[in-house]
Amino acid sequence: MEAEYGTILLASGQPKTVEEGQKTMSKGRYIILAVLCGTVALAVGVIIGWFSKPSLTEEDRAALDKFRALVRGADETVGNTIMDEIDSERIRENLRELTKKPHMAGTAPDHEMAELIRQTWLDNGLDEARLVPYDFLLSYPPMGEMGPNNTAVTVDGTDFEFEDTRTAHIEPELQGDPDAPQFFYAFSPPGNPVGELVFANYGRPQDFEYLEKNASINCTGKIAIVKYGREGRGTKATNAAAVGAVGIIIYPDPADVNVPGGQVYPDGWFLPGTGVERGSTLSDPGEPLTPGYPATDYAYRKPLGDVDVFPPIPILPISYNDAQEYLLRLSGEEVPSGWNGSLPITYRLGPGFTDDWAAREVRINVYTNTTIQRVYNVIGMINGRVEPGRFQSMVSWRS
């Protein structure tokens, strides 16, 4: 007698025999049984783990109760209250107060500012505010009878034809303080190197390699002028010295610091043509004489002659207005396309000048002064209530 049905149709329409169908159902039962056993075993393990955990100590329970109380008592309006307390006019006045006169680190005005911040914090309700002194190796621009930091075009090493502006004439009534420091790069070695000018893009190793291999320019004895960015200031000087350059000038090209059509200060927030980028030439963090340790008065200090973190050649910043005066007169072939900036000139490699500046050279005058001076951190404290022995830090610069 034939069975009423002898095949099982799959979803694909392919037939199976009854035997094959029975085997498939048996295999499915085993899989279901295995899953059930695994689930039971997992549940048993969780139950055992839960009841075998150590009980909380009284100290743990007290701490947990504090945290639960904080959550229960959380005031969701606190964030809005903080935002409502922000006063743009007060921020404006604070900024005006903190910037109304020069206060280079290690000077008397710098100490006065530290004390002002300390007292302001106390007046605003901080539990504690104090000054913490450190004796730091600092670098300063020319002072007193020292010559000015500048670049100049020279004839036979003595006759200056052009000098850069050295000061930013943006708003004289705001920038006329006689104590305003000259433009300089901190920790540049002093010196007065003279040489032909050569444009080296960003002053990276590959830029100097291009000059040598693709443009056949030997940088030995040259002054390199480079754009700000892509490498650290001190690293640019090290790169230039490695190919024989005797000095380096850095300027901020508008292509790197501004945007097309953007308004410059004081009409906008972008850098004007007289603005100069300042900063340190050091790449290592911390104080050079006490690397890795705070520069306290009792700290061991390396002899200054043993410190090798300073640039090997003089390095000086100038504005892009002054840089344009040099670059528009450079001789030599045009730069590769990736080297162009956005000054209204044809960028050329050099070396040397054309036209009325032919046979002229460039002198860099750097008169930096390095000395140990006392500086201050301002430390403010708000005592915690839940975990007073732990610290949360908020840090910012003020000098």
PLM region spans:
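Short hydrophobic alpha-helical runs that function as membrane-insertion/retention elements
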Residues: 224-226, 246-252
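Short, solvent-exposed loop/turn and secondary-structure capping segments
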Residues: 110-111, 141-142, 209-212, 235-239, ...
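N-terminal hydrophobic or amphipathic helices/low-complexity stretches enriched
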Residues: 4, 12-16, 27-37, 43-119, ...
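Soluble metallo-hydrolase cores and metallopeptidase-like ectodomains found primarily
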Residues: 24, 28, 175-210, 285-399
